[in-house]
C-alpha cells in the first residue's frame, strides 16, 4: 500500500508514542522529516534526534522529552498543509500558535523554519504543522 502523506504518518507516530509515554519513536527518514525533527529538538520539544543510515531509506530515531512528574512536553501536533489541500501563508500573515507558546513549522525558500524565524526573515511559505 502506498503512503499518501508520509509527514502526517511521522507526526502521528510522534503523537501516539508521546501519549503512550514511550521514550523513543522511530520512523522512516527523509530530508523534510529530519528538518522537522531538528526543529523540534532546537525548540526543546524532544531530547535528541538520531538518523540511522542503512542501505535503503534510513531511520530517524527521536527521543521524547517529559517533565519531572512525567507530564508531556508536546501537548499537541497538528498537520496543517496536506496533499489534498495545501496551505500557504504570506510573509505578513505568518501564524502564531497559542499566542507564541507553540510553534508553526513552515517550508520556505530558505528551508524549514519556525514561525518566529520566518517573521524575522520576512518570508512566507507552506505551513507544514503546528506544535504546542
Swiss-Prot record:
InterPro entries: Ribosomal_uS8, Ribosomal_uS8_CS, Ribosomal_uS8_sf
Domain of life: Bacteria
SUPFAM superfamilies: Ribosomal protein S8 (SSF56047)
Keyword field: Ribonucleoprotein, Ribosomal protein, RNA-binding, rRNA-binding
Region forming the signal peptide: none
A UniProt-annotated Pfam family: Ribosomal_S8
Biological process annotations from GO: translation
GO cellular component labels: ribonucleoprotein complex; ribosome
MF terms (GO), sorted A to Z: rRNA binding; structural constituent of ribosome
The family this protein is said to belong to: Belongs to the universal ribosomal protein uS8 family.
Subunit structure: Part of the 30S ribosomal subunit. Contacts proteins S5 and S12.
PANTHER family associated with the record: 40S RIBOSOMAL PROTEIN S15A (PTHR11758)
Summary of the function given for this chain in its UniProt record: One of the primary rRNA binding proteins, it binds directly to 16S rRNA central domain where it helps coordinate assembly of the platform of the 30S subunit.
HAMAP family in UniProt: Ribosomal_uS8_B
Name listed for the protein in its UniProt record: Small ribosomal subunit protein uS8
Originating organism: Streptococcus mutans serotype c (strain ATCC 700610 / UA159)
Amino acid at each position: 500500500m502506498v503512503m499518501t502523506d508520509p509527514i502526517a504518518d511521522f507526526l502521528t507516530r510522534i503523537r501516539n508514542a508521546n501519549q503512550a509515554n514511550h521514550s523513543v519513536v522511530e520512523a522512516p527518514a527523509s530530508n523534510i522529516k529530519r528538518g522537522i525533527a531538528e526543529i523540534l529538538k532546537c525548540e526543546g520539544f524532544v531530547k535528541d534526534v538520531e538518523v540511522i543510515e542503512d542501505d535503503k531509506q534510513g531511520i530517524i530515531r527521536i527521543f521524547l522529552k517529559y517533565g519531572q512528574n512525567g507530564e508531556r512536553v508536546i501537548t499537541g501536533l497538528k498537520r496543517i498543509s496536506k496533499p489534498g489541500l495545501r496551505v500557504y501563508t504570506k510573509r505578513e500573515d505568518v501564524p502564531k500558535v497559542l499566542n507564541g507558546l507553540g510553534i508553526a513549522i513552515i517550508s520556505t525558500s530558505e528551508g524549514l523554519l519556525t514561525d518566529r524565524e520566518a517573521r524575522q526573515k520576512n518570508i512566507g511559505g507552506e505551513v507544514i504543522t503546528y506544535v504546542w
